[in-house]
Amino acid sequence: MMTVRHTFREVKGICPVNGGIDFYQIIVEFTYDDDAWRDNFWHVETLSDFFNEITKTPISQESLSIKIAREFCGGDEDEPPVKRITVKTFGRHGDVRTDTEITI
């Protein structure tokens, strides 16, 4: 088993409650079976493009975390063989900082 962790230091989003700008640090951990990840794995650019797309419209931190986990859990045979995915989001909403963690 192999775990690969990607950390995105700052992703901007729009708050669905007040329309303000939210800032997130996002950590995505993929656990792959055996050495399968060497031939087929999620690229940082793919993740970054997805984050940019889903944060164009207002989204809550919880919904952001869930969408990332579901999108990259590897259910399709053409996708990387992800055994487990953990998504951690650390949000800054004005003066408030929050952490959300989801594992599938």
Describe the role of every protein-language-model region:
Residues 1-104:
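N-terminal intrinsically disordered, cationic/polar leader segments
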